[in-house]
Amino acid sequence: MRTILPGGEPFFFLGNSGIGCLLLHGLTSAPQEMRGLGEYLAARGHTVLGLRLPAHATRPRAMLHTHWEDWLAAAEDGYHLLENNVRQVIVLGLSLGGAIGLLLASSRPVVGVVAMSTPYEVPPQPRLRFLKALLQPLALLGRVIPFLPKPPPMDYRDREAARNHLTYPVMPVRAITETARLLAVMRARLAEVRVPVLLMHSIHDGGVSPANARSIYEQLGSAQKQLLWLENSGHVLTVEPAHRQVYESAAGFVERWSQPAREGLGEPDEGAATRPRRRASLGR
């Protein structure tokens, strides 16, 4: 009997650069959405570990018994596995994975973090902020109605990518409340993140408002932080038409801030990421 969905398997690529890249996927999704980025980094000689977060890529019911600490513990396991085989570790995460990466960086000596489409709070859309007051009742409701229907994704620029994206067809209520708890801890620790951080976010993200990226950027304790806005993409940056720009920017960041890369690969292209800029549409 197969328990992990096809495409939900973790992946590992052994490199020779001395750099380890820990890749973390998003909520109710799977390692599949990070694999292309992982293969790109591996082709540049880096060791890559793409984790499957607990209760993901199996069945939605597995989420009903999972806590946010389980997700963080899995990322910590991945960090320790890598650090035993490389000289430096960088975390790259999408959505929930980005939040976990930032949280990990507040307590572990990672070299840097690439956080893509990362939420600052739940709900991650300003127009839904009135729902914050419902989080506690929602946790109680989850005992009676464990799943909520997911609306069809509307922000994809690549419809084939939308069809092929491996994710649960429903949203476990428990996953929402646990994500809210994780993000509360992340917000409290952002000032403790002192390593370089690259934030990437689409200005068309329909799942996590771009305002989330601005809030994270402003509260990070790091002196080396960048915010790259993407045009031709929706929420899942790694599979959209802009994915090549995402891959190149991530690799440039990895190779800029890791000493083994500077020794062996030379200086990266300074144009790999842009300085943060204000957009009138972001708001707070």
What are these regions (language model features)?
Residues 3-59:
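Short, surface-exposed "cap/lid" segments of acyl-processing enzymes
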Residues 6-8, 172-190:
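Active-site nucleophile elbow and catalytic-triad environment of alpha/beta-hydrolase enzymes
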Residues 37, 195, 209-218:
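Short alpha-helix in the alpha/beta-hydrolase fold that links the catalytic acid
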Residues 93-97, 101:
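Gly/Ala-rich beta-loop-alpha elbow adjacent to hydrolase catalytic centers
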Residues 114-123:
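Active-site nucleophile loop of the alpha/beta-hydrolase fold
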Residues 193, 199-201, 205:
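Short beta-strand/loop motif that positions the catalytic acidic residue
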Residues 214, 218-236:
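Catalytic histidine neighborhood in serine/cysteine hydrolases
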Residues 231-284:
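Catalytic active-site module of serine/aspartate enzymes centered on a nucleophile-bearing elbow/loop
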